[in-house]
Amino acid sequence: MIRQFCCVLLLVVHSVSAQLLEDIRQLSSADMQGRETGSAGAELARRFIGERYQSLGLASFDGGYQQTFLYAGWQEKAGVNMLAYRQGCLYPQQYIVVSAHYDHLGQTGRSIFYGADDNASGVAALLELAARLSEVCPAYSYIFLATDAEENGLYGSKAFVANPPVALSHIVLNLNLDMIGRAGKRGRLYLTGARRYPALMSQLHAEFSKLQFLPHSGPPRNVRSNMRYNWPEASDHGPFHRAGIPYLFFGGHEHADYHTPEDTWQRIEPDFLAMAMQAIWHTVQWLEQQPPAVLNGQRQ
């Protein structure tokens, strides 16, 4: 049985950037058709993400941002991850992978599953982090990984771990973002994987006065709707975890619009999103101040 501790960040009001909200709106627009893997809408989403990567001056591996892969469902299917990186200045050979899945459920008949919270919000936060880190010379190198086919079984992150652009031994941490735009049924944002970093938890507790710690345990999950019971396998950090790479996962609780056509950008909660972005950025700032031994020493 896997046992994992997570912390809960309750609502704190901060301002949210216009670009963050605009990226969510664009990615969850009707033109994207729900971003189902293999669809024309997913291709539009990739084009949007690639253009944002380019506008931020992010470098690519092997001359392009796309990482294609095959996976088996009812039949063999193809997916496409979007990769970019920012070279670090102090530890350039040590990488932090920031991940967020861009795929969603597509459409059924006339009903579009827009996927604003799940997971345009996470991709927008990834882009926000990329923008902030592009303004400085970060200590670590950062890979920005927008994954495909997460909804079908974490296939994008599995493909990345199976065929990484850098050696897995050089990846010190995965920071995964999934559903951070709404408070959900419990009004909370969850952070899991942080039990490895008690100093980080102490700082977050000081910054967010209503932070709590909750134990989460359960058998390995096969169905994503069980995410609240098995945090180590809840999203794209799962394959990193299984590869022995430490992870931090920010994600919200399910809400009434989860996996429905009502998950629209108009229902994103700016105050909650701003709080989540503040917590994520605080975490990155803490990571930037740690030597590799602190992160490397947490490998399983």
What are these regions (language model features)?
Residues 27, 53, 70-109:
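Acidic/His- and Gly-rich active-site-bordering loop/insert found
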Residues 84, 98-152, 280:
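Alpha-helical metal-binding/catalytic segments enriched in His/Glu/Asp
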Residues 137, 147-249, 295:
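Metal-dependent peptidase/peptidase-like ectodomains
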Residues 35-86:
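A non-catalytic alpha/beta surface segment that caps or lines the substrate-entry region
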Residues 19-26, 40-55, 64, 121-128, ...:
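Extracytoplasmic/secreted proteins, especially bacterial periplasmic and envelope-associated proteins
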Residues 13-15:
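N-terminal signal peptide c-region/cleavage motif recognized by signal peptidases
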